[in-house]
Amino acid sequence: MANIFPPNTNKRFYGIAALVALAAAFVLGGIYYVNFSIPEYEPVQPVRFSHKLHAGDLKMSCTACHSAAQRSSRAGIPDTKSCLGCHQHILPDSPLIAPLREAADPQYPGYTGEPVRWVMVNRLSGHAYFNHMAHLNRGIGCTSCHGDVAGMERIRAPRDARMQWCLECHRNPAPHLRPLEETASSHYSAADYLRTHSIRDEEGKSIQTPLQLGNFLKRQWKIQPKTDCTACHH
């Protein structure tokens, strides 16, 4: 019986198969390295709030404003009344505070009652899930993900927020672990902490280095982060 396929059919088949395999590799690679945040995204906010001043110079803890991070999946943005809780006494007449008073101070001449519309900076893809409470309560500090907030005038999205970045921490969490009372500090240094705190491991040996401290906390809290898909994707 005569061959109904042209002589180069096999070559075409293998060529198409190779292209499909290459495309699949690019897709899977793209998923692995996908950016969850827009690189260097640093939007202008309706109120000129300086993280450098508050978290840096004044050394306020992150949870002083983002208290929801300790009890829910989202860190949240403080409501305007929380801001005025401080600023009704501190620089209340500053023009920088005016948008807050317009939104939440009925005694202010320019009061409108319109809420301040903050611009979201850190936005995960719809298929990814991150729980702030779970990380903070297991010794992961805010700066491990958000970077040097104490040095930022305007908050910006982390440059390396990729799946690979998350997996690297889940596979080796010890370098990122810190005592629970230090998770919301932008100034924490494990070396400085060990200079002022005497900590001994299970055998009574003195812990001397940051890595020893991280590994000790990992053992104490029995931390074994998941690395399968369902850990972050639901």
Which stretches of residues belong to each language-model region?
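Aromatic-capped interface at the extracytoplasmic side
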Residues: 26-43
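Structured, soluble extracytoplasmic/luminal domains of envelope-associated proteins
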Residues: 81-126
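N-terminal Lys/Arg-rich, disordered targeting/topogenic segments
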Residues: 1-9
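Sequence context surrounding c-type heme c attachment/ligation sites in exported
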Residues: 43-93, 131-234
